[in-house]
């Protein structure tokens, strides 16, 4: 065993039973398969990093890792109370919260991983549904032992595809397949795990086969027909593809936090508060989760996770975090949000603070800020990160610097795959049309949001409304009613029956004709035709901002 050999009390069979149970949990809570894969990885790495495990808490570790994975990838997380229920109240809610924080601190919030499934998705894009399901099946089979960590993700994905092709064309009476599997290390590993799982009575494994519409009797026949040679030895190894570079940040202790002096409140919301503080004689911004002694919220988990892997001059920096009775994020301080800078009553004072004379927000300054916003967005999308909630309140300014903040709604997007619209929490005025019409989405929702922010910066709010239906009607009244082919699936939102023609934004066109033409391309109803962040930046770089 790779991770578990140092724990005499926890066997590989115990691990298999845990994974089988997590498969059941994943179906009960209708999680995507990616969530299950991430949870398994987190279990293995946590076990690998700690010195001692009490076997009676092994299941607690499993359900906590599943809960963490849902916070990263699902529209709704399982929650500590449901974790207590799922585990038949073996562990109190307080114990579950404590273990979850221990896992997060031990892993240092390093939760964005390249998985076998990531490598597989792009390779099986054009497969039949049956072959795709078989690929997913063997991905989970590969992770029923912790030896999957001995192989690069790409290699396992390639082995899965070879095996799926082999089974798809399998003639029962042929012995050639036995030789082919035995001469390929990864296929042999996959087959050995398939044989183990098929010959044990595993409820989760049975559910997996049933839900993926795989013929169990056929698989049983295959495992009896194909005989493996004596076991190969897999030496313990850490698969470096599971790790991504992290920015350094501190884990502040209680004593550090007690030395904070609050200078002023910068804002508050449903998440909690943000304060400007001095910490160790330096200024910082501290975001504090509102609830006391509660599990860390999905937004806080996401924010720490994504800020740990990002390093760009137009992205806010995370100095560190503290997981106490309240979760605290220690962030780079900035003077103002873009929203406050543009529309609040403190306009004159802020202009003075930011070094802008005569209360004039010049056209060059507007272009300069927009370019910085696009530089940050380009960086996000190049790293497969969807921000998910870009608004004027989530853009910060200090003097000539602009930085993107608030990554609580951010997601990793896989190439050629779209995210479930239910995972989006984008603010109403900045919400892309596909989200309003309950369509799945990709990184282009951020481009739509930036178009709306550009409107604010240039002096013309693009869309408003008190609910989804009002916003949709407002969008249609400016951009025209879209072709129904673009949004043909059903939606629970009331769509305007009136047919609108394109009229655009007359005031904006009159003052900024060239920029407005770019904004229209950023607001394309069809996300495939919508201009990318990189292309938008290229267009804005043609304008002078000196």
From Swiss-Prot:
Active-site annotation: 389
Domain Cyclin N-terminal per the UniProt entry, residue ranges: 1-112
One protein family per Pfam: Pkinase
Hydrolase as a keyword of this entry, yes or no, is: no
Q: Which residues are listed for ATP binding in this entry?
A: 266-274, 287
Any idea where the Protein kinase domain is?
Answer: 260-544
Its recorded reaction(s) are:
L-seryl-[protein] + ATP = O-phospho-L-seryl-[protein] + ADP + H(+); L-threonyl-[protein] + ATP = O-phospho-L-threonyl-[protein] + ADP + H(+)
| PROSITE patterns, alphabetized | PROTEIN_KINASE_DOM, PROTEIN_KINASE_TYR
Enzyme Commission numbers on file: 2.7.11.1
Q: Where are the transmembrane segments?
A: none
One MF term in the entry's GO annotations: protein serine kinase activity
Q: Which UniProt keywords apply?
A: ATP-binding, Kinase, Nucleotide-binding, Serine/threonine-protein kinase, Transferase
Stored SUPFAM superfamilies: Cyclin-like, Protein kinase-like (PK-like)
Q: Which InterPro entries match?
A: Cyclin-like_dom, Cyclin-like_sf, Cyclin_N, Kinase-like_dom_sf, MAP_kinase, Prot_kinase_dom, Tyr_kinase_AS
Its family?
Belongs to the protein kinase superfamily. Ser/Thr protein kinase family.
Name of the protein in question: Putative serine/threonine-protein kinase L268
Which species expresses this protein natively?
A: Acanthamoeba polyphaga mimivirus (APMV)
